[in-house]
Every structure is written in C-alpha cells, then in structure tokens.
Amino acid sequence: MSTTLPTILMLVVGLSTLALAILRRVQSGRSPVVLTYGDDAEGFAGRLFRLIVAALVIHLLAVAMLPASVDAALGRIPALDTPILHAVGLALMTLGGGLTMLSQWAMRHSWKIGIPEKQDAPLVTSGLYAFSRNPIYVGMVTALIGTVMAVPNVISVALALSAWISISYQIRMEETHLAKVFGDAYGAYCRRVRRWV
C-alpha cells in the first residue's frame, strides 16, 4: 500500500473544507468558523478538536514522508496489517471524506464549524440530513475508521478514539443549541431522524 494515499485523501478533505469556508466568507461576509477560545465547555471542545486535527495531519504526514521510521517507532497492529484491510481502509477514508464534503456543501449557508452565537440560517433536514442528523460527523468517523485500517498503528487508534469522543461531545452541545433555537421543529426532526444513521 502506498503510504501517501491516506495523507492525500485527508488533504483533499481539508482543502475542500477550506475552500468551502472561503466561499462562505466571500458570499456572506462572515467566517463560517465560529469555534470559540473561551474557558467554557464549548471553548474546550474547540481546542480539543483543533488539537486532534493537527495531530492527525502531523501523523499522516510523518507516515507519508518517513514510513520506515514511523513503523520502527510505533510498530503496526498485526491484526489490521493486511493488504485487504489496507484497501478497505482506503475505501472507507474515500467514502467518509466524500460524505463529509458532500454534507458540508449540502448545508449551504447553514454550515458552520462550531456553534454560532446567533443562528441566522435555517435548519437543514433534507437530502443527506433526512437520513442522519449528523452526516458530516458520520463521514468523519467513517474516514477515521478507514485511517486505522489503512495506517494500523497505535497513534491512528488513539486519534480515532479521541476524535470519536470529541465529536460525540460536540454533537450533544449542538443538539442543545439547536433545540433552543428551533424548538418543536428540531424536536420533530430528532424523532424522525437518528443522530448517526
């Protein structure tokens, strides 16, 4: 397996997210990135998310540029270190990355990174959001599972678990916010559509 493919896949998703953020900024005059830096739960979740993303990027770059050194330092998880699982991992990374990008674009002007102080966009409940309340996060978790299979080492597992915990916490904070903003409409949506899938 090419050690650069996982890095390339994650960079494509990252660049797509950056392009969308720039586009939304140009269209609305405001950044869709609303992560806070406060000392409250939301600020902590934002810092944790940024730390996990930075660690994942550094890890995948190290794997791509110095595969022998990373393998020597971390070893590989033997049960996951097979060509078939590597291929499945790359497929999951591609699927998850694609789902993440499509879900971000599908939200149009409602897409934000973080919880906005003022909700000025409609609740999105159609398209991918008719099947999952959180298809962006479903895509991210799918890509992370793929990363563990494509790059089967302890750091990949630790980052995937950390991200899952962080995402699960973020979802619950967003649900509280959306329930306050959209009230009964959001409650009805929650009864109709599951949190994950």
From Swiss-Prot:
Keywords: Cell membrane, Membrane, Methyltransferase, Transferase, Transmembrane, Transmembrane helix. One of its GO terms (molecular function) is methyltransferase activity. The keyword Transmembrane helix applies. InterPro entries: Phopholipid_MeTrfase (IPR007318). It is a multi-pass membrane protein. It is an enzyme of class 2 (transferase). This is PEMT/PEM2 methyltransferase family protein. The chain crosses the membrane at residues 3-23, 51-71, 82-102, 141-161. Coiled coil: none annotated. One of its GO terms (cellular component) is plasma membrane. Belongs to the class VI-like SAM-binding methyltransferase superfamily. PEMT/PEM2 methyltransferase family. It comes from the Bacteria. It is found in: Cell membrane. GO terms for biological process: methylation. Its EC number is 2.1.1.-.
